[in-house]
């Protein structure tokens, strides 16, 4: 499971598709709307029941059966939802009355504070058992990846570089965790995608560049994310059994430093979604089936009047959550649900 987390500045299935089927799959589009005081919504993740979480009007929301619900805060003015499990439990971060941002878990209408006074924290992923991962740090201290499980909080470590920090992004039902670890190596800052397997952190490497980020992990411990290549642009990757492989880009994709292709989510059939820069320099939402990339804008059955720019989640049924970003009338983001249609 899982979602893209904006924690690096550079910047889940019974539906097994073949490459041929991928070209024929079409989707209906549902506009998720916004919370009443906003014209913008960002979407994070979708569970097997089609429940969706994200952020609108600076508040975390849960979208279920066509209704968007404001999840509130921890006493402050801001909250963000980052993940939801198949039981409908939501995690994220929210401001307290004192202004600190704390990790939260929301269930059955109640938001619970996972944070500690004097620290900043965020929850980025949750599995079906309720095990939650994220980051916590005190003022002027680098963040440390955290696992909340069984009512206890545990820091799970980093790569041990000079000035190291780490963030856990996603966790599967086996307790395998994907995230990032940063620090300094040979006098330069480095951010690397990592996975914790049986409690041991593993550096996933890169694709000819220096940096990488893991965004999601599936039931088979396949990790997806992005990695720098030799020209400092970004390439989507999948990592499994010790090997990082580059995912293909759209034909003629125009890349530049810090820009290119990113994989943001994967379901348990290994279908990956994310974004890719097109031949005209626009960013489009994409899907990879058996390693083959398709622009999701070419698969929708009705005109939306918008360009889908990033896919952030995919569930077992193949439903995809996507965003459209525009600068018309100021920068706004709208969120949509794509539902695959039977052939």
Regions found by a protein language model. Give the residues of each.
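Residue-level hotspots at or immediately adjacent to binding/recognition sites across diverse folds
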Residues: 2-10, 14-15, 19-343
């Amino acid at each position: 499971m899982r979602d893209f987390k904006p924690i690096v500045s550079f910047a889940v299935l019974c539906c097994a598709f073949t490459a041929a089927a991928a070209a024929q799959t079409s989707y209906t589009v549902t506009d998720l709307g916004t919370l009443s005081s906003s014209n913008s919504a960002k979407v994070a993740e979708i569970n097997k029941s089609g429940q969706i979480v994200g952020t609108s009007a600076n508040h975390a929301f849960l979208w279920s059966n066509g209704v968007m619900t404001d999840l509130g805060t921890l006493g402050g003015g801001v909250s963000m939802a980052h993940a939801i499990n198949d039981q409908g439990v939501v995690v994220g971060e929210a401001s307290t009355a004192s202004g600190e941002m704390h990790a939260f878990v929301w269930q059955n209408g109640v938001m619970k504070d996972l944070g500690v006074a004097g620290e900043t924290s965020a929850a980025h992923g949750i599995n079906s058992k309720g095990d939650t991962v994220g980051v916590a740090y005190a003022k002027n201290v680098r963040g440390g990846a955290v696992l909340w499980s069984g009512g206890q909080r545990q820091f799970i470590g980093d790569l041990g570089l000079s000035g190291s920090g780490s963030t856990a992004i996603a966790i599967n039902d086996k307790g395998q965790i994907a995230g990032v670890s940063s620090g300094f190596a040979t006098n330069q800052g480095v951010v690397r995608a990592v996975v914790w397997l049986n409690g041991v952190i593993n550096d996933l490497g890169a694709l000819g560049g220096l940096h990488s980020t893991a965004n999601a992990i599936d039931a088979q411990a396949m990790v997806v994310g992005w990695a720098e290549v030799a020209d400092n642009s970004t390439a989507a990757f999948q990592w499994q059994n010790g090997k990082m492989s580059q995912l293909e880009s759209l034909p003629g994709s125009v890349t530049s430093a810090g820009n290119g292709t990113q994989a943001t989510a994967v379901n348990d059939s290994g279908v990956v979604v994310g974004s890719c820069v097109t031949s005209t320099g626009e960013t489009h939402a994409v899907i990879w089936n058996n390693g083959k990339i398709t622009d999701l804008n070419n698969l929708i059955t009705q005109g939306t009047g918008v360009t889908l720019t990033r896919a952030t989640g995919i569930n077992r049924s193949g439903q995809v959550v996507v965003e459209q970003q525009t600068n018309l009338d100021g920068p706004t983001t709208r969120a949509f649900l794509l539902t695959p249609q039977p052939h």
